[in-house]
Amino acid sequence: MNILHVLSGDFVAGSETSTAAVIDYQIKLGHQVWIASGQFTHATQARVVPIPIYDRGLLRRFLNIRELTQIIRRENIHIVHAHSRAASWVSYWACRFTHTAYLSTLHGRQHLHFSNKWFNVYGPQCAAVCENIRDQMLEETRVFEPEQLVVIRNGIETKASH
């Protein structure tokens, strides 16, 4: 399977660390993996495509959608996995234009505003890394039914690879 992970990439966070562990496992299983991110500091065998997803300016968002659309088509991506609000926003539109499967993981409590309270840019299925985040989205937004939002905890690699 060809998988594209999309992250904001404006600073190192837990989402990058846990995504790196997921990517390593996906590659170990034989999947082809790409990362679109402003920066990705963890060593990885995935192909990293630098795109300033963190830049939320309107023009930049349209350019990011175009760049993601090009990657999805060029690399025959089967699924896009977004890991931040900004990543979810641009991934949602790129996947709509390309008819590509899509999901998001919510790694932290969401800063809610009109658009993400009433408009689901996170995809038809979404993972939250803990019950607190899942509960926030179910209680404070109108975008999810309970069965659309599952808790999947971040995995960690316990064996050091030195």
Predicted regions, residues:
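N-terminal strand-loop element at the rim of the active site
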Residues: 5-63
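Short beta-strand scaffold positions
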Residues: 35-37, 81-82, 128-129
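Short His-centered aromatic/hydrophobic patch
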Residues: 61, 82-88, 106
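Glycine-rich phosphate-binding loop signature in dinucleotide/nucleotide-binding domains
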Residues: 71-78
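A conserved, positively charged/aromatic
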Residues: 96-131, 143-144
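Carbohydrate-associated surface elements
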Residues: 132, 155
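A short helix/loop element that forms part of the nucleotide-sugar donor recognition site in Leloir-type
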Residues: 161-162
